[in-house]
Amino acid sequence: MATTIGFIGLGNMGGPMAANLVKAGYEVAGFDLAPACCAAAQAQGVRVVATVANAVADAEAVVTMLPAGQHVITVWTALADLVKSSTLLIDCSTIDVASARKAHGILAGKECLTLDAPVSGGTGGAKAGTLTFMAGGSAEACAKAEPILRSMGKRIVRCGEAGAGQAAKICNNMILGVSMAGVCEAFVLAEQLGLSHQALFEVASTSSGQCWALTTNCPVPGPVPNSPANNDYKPGFSAALMLKDLKLAQEASLSSGASTPLGAQAAQLYGLFEKLGHGGEDFSAIIHLLRGQLSEKRN
């Protein structure tokens, strides 16, 4: 009999992840509050159920993919009364470190194996099954979770104990936000100096300016054919999600006493970008703000 997995949160990331578990041979019982998400998951072979309790009733493992820390705490508190002590719990949401550690603590009394395992790779990686998982929890929990995670991704990095996965995700995405702002500024400067996009790309992509924000998610059309800039900035990773992660980084910076002035500046830029109505665009579209081309977007 196939291993049964309860999957809570079938949205843009969770839905494709659950579908990949089905493709890998798992029986997946899924729950989401949004009917459209449930319908999409059901079409991919997920057995959609009406409650969280139904999703985890026979589950040997539970995966949660939820919007924020408060949602994870609420669901994991409920799970403490629903799951067996042998159940493996994996949270793939991107949340603050304190909430991640609290979630682990909620299940400590049940002696369940727990893991925070946020992801990198965006919706494209979720659909393709190429996500990277940043795992926080015991070595035993990570080892038990590995076959499940490998059905949804290509790389698993155990970053440390409880909360370490979230810490790694926040730090990584602060790097991404800062580097994208820097790449965009460089293209804006090049435009003013009469240097073509292609020329700058060819130099920077093979020199010390090389980075993912340039070579994979290039913010101008042309140099990287598959980048969102060539598709009207439809998001692979939205500006709103980048802002969420930058805010989490700033919260962590404040609570830990770390100095992150560039992260703070990036958060301010993306905050303004979202306030102007562009949060649904790819985060590389911040280049329009840096060009001074944006006014408030109206529906």
Spans of model-derived segments:
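Rossmann-fold dinucleotide-binding core
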Residues: I5, L10, V75, T94-N173
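NAD(P)+-binding Rossmann beta1-loop-alpha1 motif at the extreme N-terminus of oxidoreductases
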Residues: M1-M65, L82, S86-T87, T123, ...
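Rossmann-fold NAD(P) dinucleotide-binding segment
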Residues: V52-T114
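Methionine-biased hydrophobic packing positions in alpha-helices, especially
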Residues: M13, M17, M65, C92, ...
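Hydrophobic beta-strand scaffold residues
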Residues: V28, V48, T114-L115, I156, ...
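Helical "substrate-binding/catalytic lid" subdomain
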Residues: G165-Q265, L269-L294
